[in-house]
Amino acid sequence: MAICAKRIIPPLLCTLFVLFVSPRFAYSTLAQTAAPQRSQTEVNEEAQAAYKAGTSAAAKNDFKTAETELEKVVRLVPKIEEGHSALGAVLLRLGKFPEAIKELEEALALKPGDVAAQTNLALAYAQTGAHKRAVALFEKIEAEAREKSASDPPQTLTPGLLFSYARSLAATGQLTAATAKMKSAVAESPQSADLHDALGTLYAQQRNWDLAIAQFREVLRINPQYAGGHLHLGAALLAQQQLPEAITELSLASEVAPENAAAATELGKAYAANNDDTKAIDEFNRALRLNPRSVDAMNQLALALQRTGENAKAVALLRQVVQAEPQNTEAGANLGLALLLAGNAKDAIPYLERRLAQSPRDVTAHENLAAAYMQMNEVDNAVRVLKSGLTHDPENFQLHYNLGLALKLKDDNAAAIPELEKAAKLNPTAHEPHYTLGILFMQDGRYDEAARELSLAMKMHPDNADGWATLGSLYRKMNKLPEAADALREAIRQAPDQPDAHLTLATVLAEQGNTAEAAAERKKGAELERVEMNRQRAEVATNTGNSLMKKGQVADAIERYQEALNDDPNYAAAHRALANALERQGRKAEAEAEREKADQLEKSRP
């Protein structure tokens, strides 16, 4: 909600551009550059007429005519200040800010005390972003007004001028001073919705939300149809997590100003904060239709798409954001994370490294970069980054846990175990450290400790078929056959198609003397192994077929898909790939039949 120096003249300021219209133009006693055949008197009379015509046109808001006439003045008598000052004011009204600045600077060089020229030049500076220069002139104007007030009736800056003064102060980081000026403007014109809105914006920039919200509510009391008031109030309420009211206000902003891309973007943010990414995505897309260059809308849409699993679209949008704003570290970090989630750690690492360099105390930046290094199997780099993160936050659960995993991958169990034990202490409700500790203790032959950690992990998180199978295998090694059988049966209940649990249970049952049940489990396990091997062969054949399709070798691809289905008739991916290949050959009926088989298999999948 920053106050922006837009390249437009706010309506509030339109009355500030003063044109001095003298009864007679000031004749020059200096030699002019007019044509030699004309007398100085004739030149001055023509300049006087042009000045009168120009200022008269300006008074009627005919600024194009005023510009033409006043250009004649400065051409005929370039050393007369009034011509430059009046032309500068007109150019300012026309939005020709660089040209206005040139004329107004010339006017002040000729007559430094011209308050109208000073005022208009300050406004022109503000409109072009030269806020430091604008502030210097505003300060001078204000000081001169105070000096005159000592002897004459009190003189204060107009509300419109205070408005522009405050905007320039805010742009130079002087928010306290800007707020004071804007409060003065509001006091002078308490029924101005524009001024209350600007004051509320300044409070929002300082995160003084209660005062900001009060000002925005006053804006809407004065003018219930003020779109900016609804927008800014909604954004302030969003910052305070008052989501239902924020959504209401931002919806009103969009109704009052349906072409306002910023309102659509803020409404999308409110929906996202309310965990409604479907509506958020609709609003961000609407914002981009209204303003395809909106970097904020692009960035927010990318994040929403990322949350809903559309990572490829998110990456494409974030690349556009980073290209538009190379210095936007947040967007770069988001792109790095999106690339990481897409499995492209190689491209992610430069963005994540840059983020960490810019925010060395950011724990999440350490976690993300370490994860990218792990994805690239650069385990030493991951360990280095995680240890660096712990120097900034030594009690961080995730850093200790991730470091334990990285050290485990280095087969450094002695170093990994203390990190995982620390993680378990930091977050007693997390099952992952206990499970990993159980695996490490089992690898080291420390079976009692392994059983303790694994059983604790399974109590905390029982929906883990692999965990029950591992615990069952451990109990078998410890000769705790009843416990082993119970754990393995639970593994089979959760994942009945996994062969290893059946085969291990068969061994346990045989050792218990239950030969008949052992034989049944062994037979089931062997059958599942055969199915698993067939599925693996089908996957290889299907992948080969996909490669052939990319090369345009459709007939050969069909052979590979059919080979895959001979190995595993229930492999839906092979049916779907075969359907696409048959369709390429124009065999639509056969293609549709294969596609139906794929649909049925996918629907029947648990």
Give short role names for the model-derived ranges.
Residues 47, 81-82, 115-116, 149, ...:
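Helix-start (N-cap) detector for alpha-helical repeat units in TPR-like alpha-solenoids
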Residues 60-72, 93-106, 128-145, 170-184, ...:
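Structural signature of tandem alpha-helical TPR/SEL1-like repeats
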Residues 45-76, 164-171, 201, 205, ...:
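Alpha-helical segment of the N-proximal tetratricopeptide repeat
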Residues 76, 110, 144, 188, ...:
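Structural marker of alpha-solenoid helical repeat scaffolds
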Residues 33-49, 149-158, 526-541:
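TPR-adjacent "capping" and linker segments in tetratricopeptide-repeat scaffold/adaptor proteins
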